[in-house]
C-alpha cells in the first residue's frame, strides 16, 4: 500500500462545450497521445447523433450525457476470499469510478461494433445507450444482476 495518495490531476474543459466530462471521455478514447484525432472522432459522433435526433428538443451533448447516465452502474461485485472459498461480494461504487466505468464501457462496445468509422460506431452506441439498449447498457444490467444474485454475501463487505 502506498503511503501518500497521489494528487488528483486537474483536467481542463474541452474547447467546444467547455465541459470537463467531455475531456475525460476523449482521454479514454485517445490512442498513443493523439488527442486531436480523439476530439475529431467525438465531435463527429455528436454531429451524427444531432442529425439522427434532429427533431429532439435535446442537444447532442445532452443526449450523450443522458446515455452515460443510462449505462452508469451503481453496484459491482468484487472477489473476496474467506475460509478457502471465494465469494463475489456486491459493493457500492464511488462516483469517480462510476463515471470512469460508464465511459470505458461506452467506448469498448462502440469499438466492438460493426460499422464504417469510429465516429459512426460511437454515435450508434450513444443513441442505443440513450434509448436503454445496446451492449454497454446490457453490461450495466449484467453487473446489477450479478450484484443482486450475490446479495447474500453483502455482509462480507470490505
Swiss-Prot record:
Database matches in Pfam families: Ribosomal_S7
SUPFAM superfamilies from the UniProt entry: Ribosomal protein S7 (SSF47973)
Record has Ribonucleoprotein as a keyword: yes
GO biological process, one term: translation
Name used for this protein in its record: Small ribosomal subunit protein uS7
Domain of life assignment: Bacteria
Source species: Porphyromonas gingivalis (strain ATCC BAA-308 / W83)
InterPro entries for the chain: Ribosomal_uS7, Ribosomal_uS7_bac/org-type, Ribosomal_uS7_dom, Ribosomal_uS7_dom_sf
Subunit structure: Part of the 30S ribosomal subunit. Contacts proteins S9 and S11.
Function: One of the primary rRNA binding proteins, it binds directly to 16S rRNA where it nucleates assembly of the head domain of the 30S subunit. Is located at the subunit interface close to the decoding center, probably blocks exit of the E-site tRNA.
A GO-annotated cellular component: small ribosomal subunit
This protein's UniProt keywords: Ribonucleoprotein, Ribosomal protein, RNA-binding, rRNA-binding, tRNA-binding
Signal sequence segment: none
Keyword RNA-binding: yes
NCBIfam families given in the database record: rpsG_bact
Similarity annotation: Belongs to the universal ribosomal protein uS7 family.
Family matches, as Gene3D superfamilies: Ribosomal protein S7 domain
CDD domains assigned: uS7_Bacteria
Gene Ontology molecular function terms on file: rRNA binding; structural constituent of ribosome; tRNA binding
Amino acid at each position: 500500500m502506498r503511503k501518500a495518495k497521489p494528487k488528483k490531476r486537474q483536467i481542463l474543459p474541452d474547447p467546444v462545450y467547455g465541459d470537463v466530462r467531455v475531456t475525460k471521455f476523449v482521454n479514454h478514447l485517445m490512442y498513443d497521445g493523439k488527442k486531436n484525432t480523439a476530439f475529431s472522432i467525438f465531435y463527429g459522433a455528436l454531429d451524427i447523433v444531432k442529425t439522427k435526433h434532429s427533431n429532439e428538443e435535446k442537444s447532442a451533448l445532452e443526449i450523450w450525457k443522458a446515455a452515460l447516465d443510462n449505462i452508469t452502474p451503481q453496484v459491482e461485485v468484487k472477489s473476496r476470499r474467506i475460509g478457502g472459498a471465494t465469494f463475489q461480494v456486491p459493493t457500492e461504487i464511488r462516483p469517480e469510478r462510476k463515471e470512469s466505468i460508464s465511459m470505458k464501457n461506452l467506448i469498448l462496445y462502440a469499438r466492438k461494433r460493426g460499422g464504417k468509422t469510429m465516429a459512426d460506431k460511437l454515435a450508434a452506441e450513444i443513441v442505443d445507450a440513450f434509448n436503454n439498449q445496446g451492449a454497454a447498457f446490457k453490461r450495466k444490467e449484467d453487473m446489477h444482476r450479478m450484484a443482486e444474485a450475490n446479495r447474500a454475501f453483502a455482509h462480507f463487505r470490505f
